A protein has these predicted regions:
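Alpha/beta-hydrolase superfamily serine-hydrolase fold, recognizing
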Residues: 1-157
């Protein structure tokens, strides 16, 4: 699994493996996933300034997206896996906070997996910004997230 851009990389990798008929993991974890570099999604605007970690998409994140994509269109699944194929995808655990700039990515990812008849568990944590369950790892919200993640993997592995 992975968090933020790492979650996007993991999902793009799984899509590539599936396209090549290479065996897939039994389950994966995505934390506050950045899966759409096109800036689609309501939370990019609503949580602007409310996310205490990322704060804004303008500047650093926008530059990182352009640098990562290079000449590839930002909506291509290799850089924005939300636009890819989720057929035969392993079960996915998704976590995000209500103040996360990428909350919409998490919600849309969950829906996309379900649209492909896949298994997805979405955990939204009240009041948390981007990846705060990892940053402030000794909080009740973090412990709750880790407990949910543990239960998910015990169920699917």
């Amino acid at each position: 699994g992975g968090t933020s851009a790492g979650a996007g990389l993991v999902l793009a990798l799984i899509q590539s493996l599936a396209a090549e008929s290479i065996s897939l993991p039994c389950a994966i974890y995505t934390g506050t996933p950045w899966v759409d570099l096109t800036q689609a999604g309501d939370s990019r605007h609503v949580n602007e300034g409310a996310d205490r970690v990322l704060v804004t998409y303008e500047g650093l994140l926008q530059s990182a997206a352009a640098l990562y994509a290079g000449t590839i269109d930002l909506s291509h699944p290799s850089v924005s896996p939300i636009y890819g194929d989720f057929t035969s995808f392993p079960p996915v655990f998704i976590v995000a906070g209500t103040r996360d700039l990428f909350l919409s990515d998490a919600v849309r990812l969950h829906r996309k997996i379900r649209d492909f008849n896949g298994t997805s568990q979405l955990e939204i944590v009240e009041g948390l910004s981007h990846a705060e369950y990892l940053i402030a790892h000794e909080t009740p919200e973090s412990y709750m997230t880790y407990d949910e993640l543990r239960a998910f993997f015990l169920q699917h592995l």
